[in-house]
């Protein structure tokens, strides 16, 4: 009987983790981006432009493979939807006020607010494409 309960508990915990991941991938965030269509292949030209923007604007707080002032960017598309990522780039203040994941991240990273870089939608999309390249 104890063995059966242990197995049920293990399965239950596993399902909760999958549910949390699924919830974070379905969350589109708060902002202007409601739908992003990604091609099967990474657009290298866009990714290169996104890399330049990332290096100019984001590396004071974000690293690729490890947490810094903000979270690491590698694997971001496994944790967040494309819309959420772009809304966080374009609309960080409203995101940390209204989006539960952004609020959780703000708390986790010692209430360090992400700066609004006043990027265009296209520039945020280029950064997203760079994230696809490094994934």
Predicted segments, located by residue:
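Axial heme c-ligation environment in periplasmic c-type cytochrome domains
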Residues: 69-76, 94-123
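Bacterial signal peptide processing site
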Residues: 15-19
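C-terminal capping alpha-helices of c-type cytochrome domains
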Residues: 83-88, 111-135
């Amino acid at each position: 009987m104890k063995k059966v309960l242990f197995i049920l508990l293990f399965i239950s915990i596993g399902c909760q983790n999958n549910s949390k991941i699924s919830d974070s991938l379905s969350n589109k965030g708060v902002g202007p981006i409601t739908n992003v269509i990604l091609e099967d292949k990474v657009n290298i030209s866009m990714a290169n432009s996104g890399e330049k923007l990332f290096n100019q604007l984001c590396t004071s707080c974000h690293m690729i493979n490890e947490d810094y002032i903000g979270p690491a960017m590698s694997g971001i598309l496994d944790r967040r939807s494309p819309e959420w990522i772009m809304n966080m780039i374009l609309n960080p203040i409203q995101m940390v006020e209204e989006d539960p994941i952004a609020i959780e991240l703000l708390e986790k990273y010692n209430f360090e607010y992400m700066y609004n870089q006043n990027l265009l939608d296209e520039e945020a999309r280029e950064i997203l494409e760079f994230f696809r390249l490094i994934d």
